[in-house]
Design a protein with these regions (language model features):
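Active-site phosphate-binding and catalytic loops of NTP-dependent enzymes
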Residues: 166
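N-terminal lobe of the biotin/lipoate ligase/transferase fold
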Residues: 2-163
Length: 166
């Protein structure tokens, strides 16, 4: 993982401020690298409070960490900074005969597609763009209810993890 990703994990697990010197030592990098990693996180929308003599504290925000998602889900996770469409990424993965159980994520997509190839509005900031490639052992006629079940599960997960009613 990159320095800013490890720093994010460290700050998100801390109960209070973490001293910059302590962070540099834990991560095995310079204080300048910590400062640059904080700037990168802030650029990605993460709010970090900084106080002299105390250190840094994560206030709000989140980032996508494919390694963490993969280790908790048993999925192959691919993250693109930007793509045309995560649906297209998943389709290309299927056409390349990649194994199922793959999650395709993007921070932004320029030509998002939804179900049935419909255009999907996807602004650059604030979205979660993903497509899941599975190979269910069901006949196609039994698959439509799964879209609703997945949507409900995603809603519940976001609400429980963020306390935001989406």
């Amino acid at each position: 993982m990159k320095t800013h990703e490890i720093l994010f994990q460290t700050l998100s697990q801390a109960d209070d401020y973490v001293n910059g010197e302590q962070l540099a030592k834990e991560l095995g990098v310079s204080r300048t690298s910590i400062w640059k990693a904080i700037q990168r996180l802030e650029k990605d929308g993460v709010v970090i409070e900084s106080l002299k003599k105390k250190g840094y504290r994560l206030v709000s925000g989140d980032i996508l960490l494919p390694e963490v998602i993969a280790s908790n889900t048993q999925l192959t996770v691919t993250l693109n900074e930007e793509c045309h469409s995560t649906q297209l990424d998943a389709k290309l993965g299927m056409e390349a005969h990649k194994e199922g159980r793959a999650l395709y994520l993007a921070k932004s997509q320029s030509a998002g597609k939804g179900r049935f190839g419909r255009d999907y509005y996807s602004p650059d900031q604030g979205g979660i763009y993903m497509s899941l490639h599975l190979k269910p052992q069901l006949p196609p006629a039994e698959l439509p209810p799964y879209t609703l079940m997945v949507a409900g599960a995603i809603y519940k997960a976001i609400k429980n993890l963020t306390l935001i009613d989406v």
